[in-house]
Amino acid sequence: MTMRMKKLFSILAVAATVLLTACDEHQDFPDTAMKVGHILCTDGKTMSYEDYQASGKQAIAVVFSINQREEMEGKGYAVYLWDIAPEAFADSIGVEQDTSCDLTAYDGNKNTFALYGTTDVKSPLAERVFDMWRYGQSAYIPSVAQMRLLYHAKDIIN
């Protein structure tokens, strides 16, 4: 055999091996990634609405944004489903509370800690938010940028 024939034979052998290789059985694996519109339950699990209905678990929030930016902390954002008493929003105390005024920062968590940690006066809203932590989620008052994300997702999550 000439060198050219050996090379051609090798190429044909590799091609035949690749073409004759097959899977035993195709398996579809379920998509378990968190998505916008998924339900966050009190045990910290997220699931599709259909799975939630069948689970018998208690919902606490709806996912409205998935973390795809470095400046966002956590895996994503979810909006709380239950109402907070209106008096918690009656906070016109006029005291500097070291919160950010940056309209583009995703710093709601930092701002909530600043409100909660103020020693001069207490923020009723921050106290109510910290009361929610019995479920293990890191609930906080959203920043302006986080509220914009929620606004843009309103048609998906409603």
Model-derived segments and their meaning:
Residues 19-22:
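C-terminal motif of bacterial Sec signal peptides marking the signal peptidase cleavage site
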Residues 156-158:
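Cytochrome P450 catalytic domain signature, combining two hallmark sequence patches
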Residues 6-13:
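Sec-dependent signal peptide recognition
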Residues 136-154:
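Beta-edge loop/turn motif
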